């Protein structure tokens, strides 16, 4: 028997190193010049990737950012949880804007479906939690992953067998309606109405459904480059994030293998995305926090400025993001977990005009000095940040495309981030448009 073909294409994983919203969408779009396929491997439509192309803003939630490049194939892997309603709404929005989607989008038959009862449970739980809410987007992501782990999930391929789908749906509704009515004080969902809503999606999805794992292997064997587009960020990872204030999937680079069906040896370069400062949406500890719109005790003027200049509002929820200084100790944890090859720093221009810039390089935790983010939200909440201070710069970095054009103080700040992180900065984003980028090392070439 002959050995499997060795990958000839080069694969890059783009991963968030913070609490999401790092600017991954723009970077994926920029790098897609050198990739023939872009893959989503986890999460659902709770993550919004914002792209500014030619001054026009596009927000993608499910479909990979590569869809904005003509001729690039886009894949939704088995690790994603899929809302057909959200998917087709996004497809309609893109195609009405002249973007061809259906002929370029491929969906794994093993992808877990989000059903109406997942959304109902998600919203009802947050209401019941009250002040202790996690801060989910209410889109059914967590409950869908729960069903997957409990081995009762319905998958895309199940839509192609209506009798089987109906049987499994009835079983699931019996279970979830009990939870809704008896524990969450929510009305039961109707079986027939749910079935009638879901079954027609089978015919609409069928032309896009394929064996994604096999197609990715074949693409690499043919010499094509692939990009794996992470959603959310490392500090929201179900295992490695600030648990329990996390998302319901693994957001780290290693999950690109499991969530798309490729071997881990096929992940050749890990590009970690970090803002020049930190943001977080929803609840959970944030050691270097300066500003939280919902917390009167967190109204530092610099944090307010970061939020306003950086336009820090959730692209999916519209919720204001909490802001703070860049946390290099948390970044160090993310780099280790992901095996990051190089960093891309985004939104450097948001720091323009600040007299002083701070960088969190460690913490005091229960009287001890540590230089890496601890595990678990309780420990993180007790961390007191240890800062280094840097002089700011008054000249604008917006839109710059060359390292030498950066102010010397900005260069010094970036070099110190590299030193603390222990890996090089490969790219710097100086604005929202794809061309407002400084390239130092190319993930597909260096």
Curated annotation (Swiss-Prot):
Record-listed substrate binding positions: 315-321
Designated name of the protein: Adenylosuccinate synthetase
GO biological process: 'de novo' AMP biosynthetic process; IMP metabolic process
Binding site for GTP: 20-26, 48-50, 321, 347-349, 429-431
Residues binding Mg(2+), per UniProt: 21, 48
Signal peptide: none
Keywords, sorted A to Z: Cytoplasm, GTP-binding, Ligase, Magnesium, Metal-binding, Nucleotide-binding, Purine biosynthesis
Binding site for IMP: 21-24, 46-49, 137, 151, 232, 247, 319
Primary role: Plays an important role in the de novo pathway of purine nucleotide biosynthesis. Catalyzes the first committed step in the biosynthesis of AMP from IMP.
Alphabetical list of NCBIfam families matching this protein: PRK01117.1, purA
GO molecular function: adenylosuccinate synthase activity; GTP binding; magnesium ion binding
UniProt subunit comment: Homodimer.
One annotated Gene Ontology cellular component of this protein: cytoplasm
Organism of origin: Ralstonia nicotianae (strain ATCC BAA-1114 / GMI1000) (Ralstonia solanacearum)
Enzyme Commission code(s) on record: 6.3.4.4
Subcellular location: Cytoplasm
Names of the cofactor(s): Mg(2+)
């Amino acid at each position: 028997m002959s050995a499997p073909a060795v990958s000839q294409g080069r694969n890059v994983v783009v991963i968030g190193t913070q609490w999401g919203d790092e600017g991954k969408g723009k970077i994926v779009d920029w790098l897609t010049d050198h990739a023939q396929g872009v893959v989503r491997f986890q999460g659902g439509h709770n993550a919004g990737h914002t792209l500014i192309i030619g001054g026009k803003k596009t927000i993608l939630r499910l479909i990979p950012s590569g869809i904005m490049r003509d001729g690039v194939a886009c894949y939704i892997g088995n690790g994603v949880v899929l809302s057909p309603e959200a998917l087709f709404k996004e497809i309609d929005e893109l195609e009405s804007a002249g973007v061809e989607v259906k002929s370029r989008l491929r969906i794994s038959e093993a992808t877990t479906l989000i059903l109406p009862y997942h959304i109902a449970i998600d919203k009802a739980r947050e209401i019941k939690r009250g002040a202790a809410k996690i801060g989910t987007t209410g889109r059914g992501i967590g409950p869908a992953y729960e069903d997957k782990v409990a081995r009762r999930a319905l998958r895309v391929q199940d839509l192609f067998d209506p009798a089987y789908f109906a049987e499994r749906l009835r079983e699931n509704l019996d279970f979830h309606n009990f939870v809704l009515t008896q524990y969450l004080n929510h009305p039961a969902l109707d079986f027939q109405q749910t079935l009638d809503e879901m079954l027609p999606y089978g015919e609409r999805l069928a032309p896009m459904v394929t064996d994604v794992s096999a197609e990715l292997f074949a693409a690499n064997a043919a010499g094509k480059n692939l990009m794996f587009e992470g959603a959310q960020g490392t500090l929201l990872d179900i295992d490695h994030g600030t648990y329990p204030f996390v998302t319901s999937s693994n957001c780290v680079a290693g999950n690109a293998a499991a969530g798309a069906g490729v071997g881990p040896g096929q992940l050749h370069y890990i590009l970690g995305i970090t803002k020049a400062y930190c943001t977080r949406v929803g609840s959970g500890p944030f050691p270097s926090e300066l500003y939280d719109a919902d917390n009167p005790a967190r109204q530092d003027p610099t944090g307010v400025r970061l939020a306003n200049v950086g336009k820090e509002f959730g692209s999916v929820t519209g919720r204001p993001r909490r802001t703070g200084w860049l946390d290099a100790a948390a970044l160090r944890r993310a780099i280790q977990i992901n095996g990051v090859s190089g960093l891309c720093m985004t939104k450097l221009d948001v720091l323009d005009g600040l007299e002083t810039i701070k960088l969190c390089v460690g913490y005091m935790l229960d009287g001890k000095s540590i230089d890496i983010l601890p595990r678990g939200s309780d420990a993180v909440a007790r961390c007191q940040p240890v800062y280094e201070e840097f002089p700011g710069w008054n000249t604008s970095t917006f839109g710059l495309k060359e390292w030498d054009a950066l102010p010397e103080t900005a260069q010094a700040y970036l070099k110190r981030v590299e030193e603390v992180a222990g890996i090089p900065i490969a790219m710097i984003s100086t604005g929202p448009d794809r061309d407002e980028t400084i390239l130092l090392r190319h993930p597909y070439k260096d």
